[in-house]
């Protein structure tokens, strides 16, 4: 009897696992407006955070590639764009984002060891956003990025 129950549980697990693999998540992008204050200047940015779908040579979806992007509002004709590929394996671009490149930064007291969150959040006067737009990208398998479809597993 016990073996039969384990068999039923295994079948249910397989059925729900197969169903979960059939649903491929869709790329999403979230938009907001952020402000960076450096010295006496205030800069407004269009902020995008989300994922973009990557496809293979047969046009099958293989991954969602995560990103966070800041684009200055106003005159942008000759403004450079910095593409930042940080993180991995196992770590997203979060620490580069919240440590130096983004409009905000977290305050840490020790460069070698820090306690768990929550961290104090401040405007980031060291950000390069006053000089360039920034696109931070998470390697596949970190942060917002993930394998999807037949590539998963």
Segments from the language model and where they lie:
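Catalytic-loop region of hydrolases
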Residues: 20-81, 99
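N-terminal cap/lid subdomain of alpha/beta-hydrolase-fold enzymes
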Residues: 61-153
């Amino acid at each position: 009897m016990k073996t039969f129950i384990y068999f039923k549980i295994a079948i249910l697990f397989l059925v729900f696992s197969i169903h979960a693999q059939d649903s491929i998540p869709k790329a999403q992008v979230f938009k907001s407006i952020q402000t960076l204050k450096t010295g006496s200047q205030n800069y407004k940015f269009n902020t995008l955070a989300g994922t973009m779908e990557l496809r293979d040579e047969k046009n099958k979806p293989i991954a969602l590639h995560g990103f966070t992007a800041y684009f200055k509002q106003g005159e942008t004709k000759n403004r450079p764009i910095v593409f930042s590929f940080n993180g991995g394996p196992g770590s997203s671009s979060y620490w580069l984002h919240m440590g130096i490149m983004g409009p905000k930064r977290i305050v840490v007291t020790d460069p070698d060891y820090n306690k768990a969150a929550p961290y104090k959040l401040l405007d980031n006067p060291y950000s390069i956003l006053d000089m360039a737009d920034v696109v931070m990208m998470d390697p596949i398998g970190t942060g917002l990025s993930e394998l999807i479809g037949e590539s998963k597993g």
